[in-house]
């Protein structure tokens, strides 16, 4: 029995917020701010966006390790945040997130048509998220009401390790019956999500304008001048540079051209691990 390189993609494994739903990834960001505020600790939207893509407990732990935020916490409680304190913030974050997730549940404009086209081309649609299952269940329900149903969903607490570890992406490979990780493309708007795909041995596509890095609504994105948009693209490309995505595109609507190019490269014998 011999190993043969895959010659075309079999699956796209997609993030959720900032990738398929919630243009600008506002749902988790705003709730982090509100959860910390309930402990009288101020966290800005920009600070809250920093670790986006990680599991939510890890996200809060990372925020609490930021020296400026740790100092604000110390001024209120007389100590820097422990893991128990992180859990307390997380336990407040969760019901707030579930309560308000519907506010930011709209599909990214054009995403449904794009994904329909990918399926017509034979791709399976896997998915994973930094949300835990209790939140993902609500996100999935709301997306279905808007016409989007992924073939598989993996929440951050359904594997031993969340992003940037590869476990969630690999769980999709197993569930979808994919025979080679190189026949998968991971699409995400965050650095941890791209690292997840890289570590899983997949092709990776970073979304520059629809997610956390740009942090604008669809209307705000559309209103950017050509000069400002190009400046923001350059800034965000630099943010992703260390995670080495194979492709960077504005939104998921640019994905079909990337899929075609990956299939061309696979047919030539190229593999994602080599680039």
Swiss-Prot record:
Keyword entries, A-Z: Hydrolase, Magnesium, Metal-binding, Schiff base
GO terms under biological process: DNA repair; organic phosphonate catabolic process
Catalytic-site annotation from UniProt: 15 (nucleophile), 56 (schiff-base intermediate with substrate)
Pfam families in UniProt: Hydrolase (PF00702)
UniProt catalytic activity: phosphonoacetaldehyde + H2O = acetaldehyde + phosphate + H(+)
EC nos: 3.11.1.1
UniProt family annotation: Belongs to the HAD-like hydrolase superfamily. PhnX family.
Identification of the protein by name: Phosphonoacetaldehyde hydrolase
Organism: Pseudomonas putida (strain ATCC 47054 / DSM 6125 / CFBP 8728 / NCIMB 11950 / KT2440)
Gene: phnX
